[in-house]
Amino acid sequence: MNTSDLFEQIPSKRRSLKDLATYIKTKSGNSPNYSIFLGAGASVTSGISSGTQLVEEWRKEIYELSSSSAYTDVKTARQYLIDKESSWYDPTNEYSSLFQKKFDLPAQRRRFVEKQVDSKLPSIDYSYLVSLFQSAYFDTVFTTNFDDLINEAFYQFSRERPTLCAHDSSIKGVSVNSSRPKIIKVHGDYLFDSIKSTLNETESLEINTKEKLIEFTKKYGMIFIGYAGNDRSWIGPYISRHFLSLYPLLVRRRRYSRGERYPSALCGCHSL
């Protein structure tokens, strides 16, 4: 389901950034109304390649190797992969299928991720987000990212120390009612062997992670930042069945190039 489909099916749920800022600000005591969900786009301003950038790079490389032809355009490359490489290529989930093709072994994928995130530091945008946690507008962030930027941001910009859950076994004990900042890594951490990036890996979440995510979305709204929803875990069916019926929806869809700042998402919220 893409943005246009959502706007067409539930136009009454569409909200502006100004509306969102009002919803965030209107809360009772220190209890927030929303949790944050960070995707790969949230790390672009820290110098980490976005999923879109990696897909473009891998598609070109694999097309040229497979076809023995020079890369000309996206449409030609995609059609070739659909026609000739359908045994592994999934056009609806290019990131995972291309990632698995390029890095066949889990150890290779982990080393690639480690190289991507090595020495990267939180951008100023993360300081805005941390300040919102300090003001009790949020207390939980879910993320599909393997980097440690949000955790490092708390140590760099705040005296608060978050609870970090980077493995399924550590998630079960997280309390939805705790006011301490919580970071829950949906796909794991690159330091563990169990990171989830390929098609089969992202099709299923560990049971504790899935249950905790459902528990939080029943109590809080969810604000997505930099997340395209291209994994095949819970996002499609769960949102369709539950999430859209529980909370108003704000959809903001755009691509970020390397070094581009968030135009208003975090900075706008900071004006609270």
Predicted regions, residues:
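Extended basic-aromatic, gly/pro-enriched interface segments that bind polyanionic ligands
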Residues: G226
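Conserved catalytic-core helix/loop/strand module for nucleotide-ribose chemistry
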Residues: M1-G221, G229-L272
